[in-house]
Amino acid sequence: MGNTNTVYRLGPGREVDDIVEGQIYLGNVQGFATFGTFVLLNDRVKGLLHKSNVKSEKKERDQILVQVNQIRPNGNIDLREVTLAEDSYETQLVTKKIMLSRLADLKNKIGRNVTIEADVVQIKQTSGPTIFTICDDSGVEDAAAFTEAGVRSYPEVNLGDVVRVFGEATRRNNQMQIEVSDMHVLKGTEADAVRVRINKALEARAEPPENVVPLIESDVLSALWSEMRKLAKIIRRAVLTHQPIILRHHADADGICAAVSVETAVMQYIRDNGGDPDQDNYLFRRSPSKAPFYEIEDVTRDLDMMLKDNVRFGQKLPLILLMDNGSTEEDMPSYKMTEVYQLDVVVADHHHPDETIDKYLLAHVNPYHVGGDFGVTAGMLGTEIARLINPAVEPKILHFPAVAGVADRSEAPELDAYLSLIDGKYTKDECKDMALALDYEQYWLRFNDGREIVKDILNLNNAPDRHNRLVALLVTEANAAIEDQ
C-alpha cells in the first residue's frame, strides 16, 4: 500500500455508528475463541476477527490493525487483519470535538473527565499501575493507567512521545492525578502542533524575571549577565520539563557556596512548579568533586547512576551543571563521554577557560570571557545565577558571595561590594570562619554532599545558635589540624 494510508482509532465513548465499513482501525486483542479473536476498538466497541482472517500471532492486549468487513444489523462487527509498515500510515482519532483541559486546571475539575495533550517526561512501572508523568504548556502531573498489577499499560507509549490522555481528574495523597481511561500517541502534524504549543509556553515560563539585575555594580557581572540569564533559563526549563539535574562542583568553600546557592534556588523552584511533592529528592543531586575539573571518575559515577535511573524509573537523561570547575582542557575527556550520551552540559566557573571545550556546552559563564579573572569567584557567579532561577531565595544566600570571596582570597573589587551588602549581619571574619568550616567539614565528608550540615554552616536552617556553635567548633578543630601539620 502507499504512504498515505489512514488508520483510525475509535475514541472513548464512540459507538458502532461511528465506524465505517472498509476503513482500517487500530484495536487491541481482548481474547480468543475457537472461531477467532475478539478485538477491542475502544472502551465500548469490539469486533470479531474470524480465524480465517488472522495473519499474525497475537497475545491479549497486543495492538492490531483490522479492516471492517461488515457491520451486521444486530451491531456485530466482522473484521479482517491487515499489516502495514509503521511508517506507511498516520493514525487519526475518531471522536467528537475535543475540549482540551490544562494540567494546571485539574484541581478545579476533580471527579470530572478531562482530555489532556502533553509530552511524556517519565514512565514508571509500579507494582500496581503504570505512572506516566506528563508535561503540557501549564505544568507537570501524573497519569495512572492500570491493566493489571505490575503489568505495563500502553506499552506503545515511550518517553518523549506526545500523547492525548483521557481520564478522570482525581486527588491522590494530596497530589493531582489523572486516572486514565484511554491514551494514544499523537504523530505527524498533530504531534508537531502540540510540541510547538508546549515549547512556546515553556520558553516563556523558563525565562528569568526581567527585573533581576546584579546585586552590585560590576562591569564583569554586567557583561556576563546575558550568559548567566541563558544558563538560568536552561536550569528553569529542566525543572519545568521534569529533566533531572546533576550539579557537580569543586569540593572547597567557593565551590560549595556556588553550588548550594543554586541548590537552594532549584529545590524551591521544583517544589513551586512540580506535581509530586517528593520530586526534589530525585530530580536534583549535588555532588562535590575533589579536583577542580570534571574527572573521569566523576563522570563515570554520574553516567552509572543516571543510566540506572533511566532504566528503573523511566527518567530523562539529566542536565549536567558544573560549578567552580568545567572550563579547562582537563575537562575534555569527560565531555567526550557526555557527548556519547548526548547530555546537556552547562558551566559556571572562574578558572582560566579553554575555548576548545565550548562545543560541548549549552552555556558557559566565565569572567575571563569578558575581560575579568578568577577574582570574580564561582560563589559570586552562583549566587547571581540562583537569583535568576528563583529571586525569592536572595535573602537566604546574600552572604554567600562574601564567604566565597574570602575563601578564595579574592582581591577583586566585587568582594568589598558583596561584603557591604551584609554589613551589620556578618563581619568579614565571620565569613572567613564559615569558609574555613566548610573546607574542614568537606574534608571529612569526602564525596558526600553533607546537605544539612553544610546548610547549618551557612546558616540556612533557621538555627542561628546551632550555626554559631558548629562553626566555632569546626574552626577550632581546623586550626588545631593546621598547627599539627
Regions found by a protein language model. Give the residues of each.
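Single-stranded RNA-binding regions, centering on S1/OB-family and related RNA-binding modules
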Residues: 1-117, 122, 126-130, 136-149, ...
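Conserved beta-strand elements of beta-rich interaction domains across eukaryotes
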Residues: 139, 170, 369-370
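Gly/His-enriched, cation/cofactor- and phosphate-binding structural elements
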Residues: 143-155, 159, 171-179, 184-186, ...
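N-terminal accessory interaction module
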Residues: 160-167
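Hard-cation-handling environments
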Residues: 241, 410-485
